[in-house]
Amino acid sequence: MAPRRAACLLPLLVAVASAGLGGYFGTKSRYEEVNPHLAEDPLSLGPHAAASRLPAACAPLQLRAVLRHGTRYPTAGQIRRLAELHGRLRRAAAPSCPAAAALAAWPMWYEESLDRLAPRGRRDMEHLARRLAARFPALFAARRRLALASSSKHRCLQSGAAFRRGLGPSLSLGADETEIEVNDALMRFFDHCDKFVAFVEDNDTAMYQVNAFKEGPEMRKVLEKVASALCLPASELNADLVQVAFLTCSYELAIKNVTSPWCSLFSEEDAKVLEYLNDLKQYWKRGYGYDINSRSSCILFQDIFQQLDKAVDESRSSKPISSPLIVQVGHAETLQPLLALMGYFKDAEPLQANNYIRQAHRKFRSGRIVPYAANLVFVLYHCEQKTSKEEYQVQMLLNEKPMLFHHSNETISTYADLKSYYKDILQNCHFEEVCELPKVNGTVADEL
């Protein structure tokens, strides 16, 4: 094929290649990937909204939501790696290599200072607020107090402000008057857990499975294919550069809603491999890979139940609920450990570098669990004409879909049963003890 004709076909190849990639971007996935109906109507409550409602005899008392920030720009590190790859292509691109030439001509518009919330991310939060208000109108009624907290990261603070703005004048406070409490102790508990930082965050060997997969046959095949498309020796690429090209495809889709020319480098099978690489990192750094990943989140889990307890006590005393709406904005790294602590999305076999094929139908897919704007919502209800035990019930929603409780396989649980199921975590998971560095003969011991 002549170079000119091949270059003309590139847009078509991009469109075809990217059509099936959106579901494989892991933690860089759009929220619409888990709720496709929002692509048509961002305020839709979805086809099964009515089925998730409780009987009229049950009135919501409190909503506690833990959110991931909305769509963000790439990190500074990702932008540096992209600049490195883009620079190589600009230096080496030849007219006879249309894919490389097209990418070399691609405008590198990212800047390291962009490590913040994208405009799309603000809309994510505004629309989420409006949908939650429509789903739970009694809780979001006028003169209801909203307690809004966030991690100290700018993208989270911006997301919190956008969430409040999405509610408009529906609450008693003006859009700019609700203060956002910075609470890194709960939203970035992982930074405050010495054991996690020492044994996982700062320990290269903790990511052994991730690094092994980068050097494994599946990634080698993808790398060689990308190198061939770019007319580069395979030795000039590595797994990190291939991954940043794939992530650029994801960012262009999430931020600009456009199909990036970078997407043309990857087939759906390539995307599955790169998704697994992302999931391996999430699994070993934030999920079930090490107990400390999830146990460090017990401080947040316990706080959720302390607030639910308080609401139950106030209701029993016929007092107004002091905190009917509690919304906290954190990160994928906030939600993933919390869900692992609760036992969700756990596979029978651990994710490892050598079982990619066997994990084709795994539960642990980070893009399905914690995409941009992911949200875990606890709703406490008071139900009339019930026994004392059944008077208070709880519903959990992940990304606006009711979750099944482990102990009942139902989407509604009595509050007493839920507390009983998680009794060990609520009573015996002490953050200071869990996160304390173990010492042997006066020196820190490595437990991993």
Swiss-Prot record:
InterPro entries: His_Pase_clade-2, His_PPase_superfam, Histidine_acid_Pase_euk. A motif (Prevents secretion from ER) lies at residues 445-448. One of its GO terms (biological process) is intracellular monoatomic cation homeostasis. It catalyses: 1D-myo-inositol hexakisphosphate + H2O = 1D-myo-inositol 1,2,4,5,6-pentakisphosphate + phosphate; 1D-myo-inositol 1,2,4,5,6-pentakisphosphate + H2O = 1D-myo-inositol 1,2,5,6-tetrakisphosphate + phosphate; 1D-myo-inositol 1,2,5,6-tetrakisphosphate + H2O = 1D-myo-inositol 1,2,6-trisphosphate + phosphate; 1D-myo-inositol 1,2,6-trisphosphate + H2O = 1D-myo-inositol 1,2-bisphosphate + phosphate. It is an enzyme of class 3 (hydrolase). Glycans are attached at N203, N257, N409, N441. Keywords: Cell membrane, Endoplasmic reticulum, Glycoprotein, Hydrolase, Membrane, Secreted, Signal. The active site is at H69. Optimum pH is 4.5-7.5. PROSITE patterns: ER_TARGET. PANTHER family: MULTIPLE INOSITOL POLYPHOSPHATE PHOSPHATASE 1, MULTIPLE INOSITOL POLYPHOSPHATE PHOSPHATASE-RELATED. This is Multiple inositol polyphosphate phosphatase 1. SUPFAM superfamilies: Phosphoglycerate mutase-like. Induction: Repressed by parathyroid hormone-related protein PTHLH/PTHRP. Disulfide bonds: none annotated. It is found in: Endoplasmic reticulum lumen; Secreted; Cell membrane. Its EC number is 3.1.3.62, 3.1.3.80. Residues 1-19 form the signal peptide. N-glycosylated. Monogastric animals cannot hydrolyze dietary inositol hexakisphosphate (InsP6) which makes up the bulk of organic phosphates in soybean, grains and other plant seeds which are the primary source of animal feed. The high activity of the chicken protein toward InsP6 offers a genetic strategy for improving InsP6 digestion in poultry and reducing the pollution that results from high phosphate content in manure.
